């Protein structure tokens, strides 16, 4: 089988350039001037739209909207045959006239049937003056259920707003009382701020003996003298000392929930508190030096109370502002 080999043709370097023949029809078709001519000669079609009746819009509409006035004669458009039967709706509008009010867009069905020649009796229509709306742009009246629903929604909205206002007032009062307790409010001076404040000092479990002239076990009056008239005898009534009879079981009388304290500090001065120039605070008590340091604040409220075991009463002295830790300086 012989193999196909294309013939090599040398490229023309010099000589006239070949031009392709242009089709004259294509040239004329895309000519702008000729295109304008046949576009301008094309006639525009005339569209004639006619309508009549109560639902028609335009010059032939018989309703009370824009267009032909009520009671005018119906004029058919050109090239349209005139209808044989008369426009009953236009007669009805001309006879009834135009009244200002809600009956502007209403049609009386009974009169309309009489003008059209229809017999009444096929449909039972209750009421003599039955009006049917055709075209209206008015708002429909709300029913009783809708009114009650709107009143309920407005009442709920008002209640929610009142609850939110009460909650905001409560939060504002809480923040104000907390700021006063923490001392964040504006004070007249620093002296007034730190005046009459109690400080809680936490001591170790064991303390040194107190040295001094104070009586460790003072004697309290155990008798009561009643004043009587002059010349008569005086009766002395002895009263039991609760300190002597209540220390055996650790309780006083029947107060099982209030234990009697076993430690009785002496009356008088128990130590000396020194504040150094460097800012260090020490406490000398019983010949032992203690270091006083600031403690951490608690997140809960702490108050000081004094308990009277005899009268079963408690006195609240208030809350302390600062907490100090006392530890021995070895």
UniProtKB/Swiss-Prot annotation:
Annotated segments matching region Disordered: 1-103, 212-254
Gene Ontology biological process terms in this record: tRNA transcription by RNA polymerase III
Molecular function per GO: DNA binding
Coiled-coil stretches noted in the UniProt entry, renumbered to this chain: none
Major place of residence: cytoplasm
Compositionally biased intervals (Basic residues): 1-14
Any single Pfam family the record assigns to this protein: RNA_pol_Rpc4
The entry's keywords: Cytoplasm, DNA-directed RNA polymerase, Nucleus, Transcription
Cellular component aspect of the GO annotation: cytosol; nucleus; RNA polymerase III complex
Assembly notes: Component of the RNA polymerase III (Pol III) complex consisting of 17 subunits.
Keyword Mitochondrion: no
Annotated protein name in UniProt: DNA-directed RNA polymerase III subunit rpc4
Biased segments, Basic and acidic residues type: 15-36, 231-250
Gene: rpc53
Subcellular location: Cytoplasm; Nucleus
Function: DNA-dependent RNA polymerase catalyzes the transcription of DNA into RNA using the four ribonucleoside triphosphates as substrates. Specific peripheric component of RNA polymerase III which synthesizes small RNAs, such as 5S rRNA and tRNAs. Essential for tRNA synthesis. The RPC53/RPC4-RPC37/RPC5 subcomplex is required for terminator recognition and reinitiation.
């Amino acid at each position: 089988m012989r193999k196909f080999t294309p013939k090599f043709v040398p490229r023309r370097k010099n000589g006239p350039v070949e031009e392709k023949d242009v089709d004259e029809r294509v040239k004329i078709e895309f000519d702008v001037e000729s295109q304008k001519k046949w576009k301008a000669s094309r006639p525009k079609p005339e569209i004639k739209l006619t309508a009549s009746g109560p639902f028609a819009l335009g010059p032939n509409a018989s309703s009370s909207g824009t267009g032909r006035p009520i009671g005018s004669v119906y004029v058919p458009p050109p090239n349209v045959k005139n209808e044989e039967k008369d426009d009953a709706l236009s007669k009805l509008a001309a006879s009834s006239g135009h009244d200002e009010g809600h009956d502007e867009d209403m049609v009386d069905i009974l009169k309309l049937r009489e003008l059209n020649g229809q017999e009444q009796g096929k449909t039972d229509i209750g009421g003599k003056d039955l009006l049917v709306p055709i075209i209206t742009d008015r708002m429909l009246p709300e029913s009783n259920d809708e009114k009650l629903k709107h009143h309920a929604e407005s009442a709920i909205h008002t209640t929610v707003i009142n609850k939110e206002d009460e909650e905001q007032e409560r939060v504002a009062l809480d923040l104000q009382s907390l700021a006063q307790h923490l001392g964040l409010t504006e004070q007249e001076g620093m002296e007034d701020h730190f005046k009459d404040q109690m400080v809680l000092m936490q001591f170790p479990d064991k303390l040194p003996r107190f040295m001094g002239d104070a009586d460790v076990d003072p004697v309290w009056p155990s008798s009561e003298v009643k004043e009587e008239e002059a010349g008569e005898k005086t009766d002395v009534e002895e009263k039991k000392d609760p300190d002597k009879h209540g220390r055996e079981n650790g309780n006083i009388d029947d107060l099982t929930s209030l234990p009697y304290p076993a430690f009785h500090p002496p009356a008088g001065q128990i130590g000396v508190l020194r504040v150094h120039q460097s800012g260090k605070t020490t406490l000398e008590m019983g010949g032992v030096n203690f270091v006083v340091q600031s403690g951490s604040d608690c997140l809960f409220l702490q108050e000081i109370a004094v308990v009277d075991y005899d009268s079963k009463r408690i006195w609240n002295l208030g809350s302390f502002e600062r907490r100090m830790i006392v530890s021995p300086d070895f």
